[in-house]
């Protein structure tokens, strides 16, 4: 997936500026994002878009898919405002801001001209840029990933209950959420289901290259 950091930054900020609810500090939020690595950070360390600009690209991908899902399942009219979709999609991964750092990773490069050999063939060692999670002392910690993202977002945008639930639980029932039972949460809050679906479609289908 080709990523244009500057174009994505412009689009992300343009969407965020459409949030106009009382109490929202959008200017402060944008300043926070621009003062961080949000627009240049990866979306993960290994699984999807683990490249510069991946986090912002993923957030926009989730937004686009979320809009499509809402239009698909609510053809007669969405129960959610455009503002709600913008907020939960763009902000669901705020926890990943300033979370990762670059390090040099040694990898095997296989070719017929390799000077070394293993069971897979000839290779040479090469150094590539990779990402890893910072130590807990060097990044924001509050709760699990979803809770961290909800807290950061709520600092700048007053969230309605369903928005908070959606951001907090967007990863679904993985290990970090145990011993929570996600079924009653998803049964009560459809926005949480839709955000979860959009996130997973983006991660495992659209960005799975």
Task: Show which residues each predicted segment covers.
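Non-catalytic interface/linker regions that flank or bridge core catalytic/transmembrane domains
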Residues: 1-41, 45
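Generic structural signal for well-ordered, non-membrane alpha-helical segments
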Residues: 5-9, 55, 59, 160
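Polar/charged alpha-helical tracts
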Residues: 10, 14, 28-31, 71, ...
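Generic alpha-helical structural signal
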Residues: 10-13, 27, 60, 64, ...
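Amphipathic alpha-helical segments within well-ordered protein domains
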Residues: 13, 17, 63, 67, ...
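Extended interaction regions within the primary functional domain
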Residues: 24-35, 70, 174, 184-187, ...
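A glycine-rich, hydrophobic loop/mini-helix early in the fold
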Residues: 30-81
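Divalent metal-dependent catalytic cores for phosphoryl transfer on phosphate-bearing substrates
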Residues: 47-51, 57, 75-208
């Amino acid at each position: 997936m080709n990523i244009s950091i500057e174009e994505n930054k412009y689009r992300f900020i343009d969407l965020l500026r459409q949030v106009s609810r009382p109490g929202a500090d959008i200017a402060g939020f944008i300043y926070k994002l621009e003062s961080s690595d949000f627009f240049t950070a990866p979306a993960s360390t290994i699984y999807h878009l683990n490249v510069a600009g991946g986090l912002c690209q993923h957030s926009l991908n989730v937004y686009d898919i979320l809009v499509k899902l809402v239009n698909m399942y609510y053809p007669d009219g969405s129960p959610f405002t455009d503002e709600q979709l913008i907020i939960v999609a763009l902000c669901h991964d705020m926890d990943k801001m300033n979370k990762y750092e670059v390090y040099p990773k040694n990898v095997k490069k296989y070719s017929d001209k390799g000077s070394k050999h293993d069971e897979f063939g000839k290779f040479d060692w090469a150094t590539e840029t990779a990402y890893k999670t910072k130590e807990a002392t060097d990044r924001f910690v509050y709760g699990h990933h979803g809770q961290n993202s909800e807290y950061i977002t709520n600092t700048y945008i007053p969230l309605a209950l369903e928005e908070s639930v959606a951001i907090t639980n967007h990863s679904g029932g993985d290990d970090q959420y145990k011993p929570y039972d996600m079924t009653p949460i998803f049964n009560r809050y459809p926005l949480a289901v839709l955000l979860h679906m959009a996130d997973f479609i983006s991660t495992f289908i659209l960005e799975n290259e």
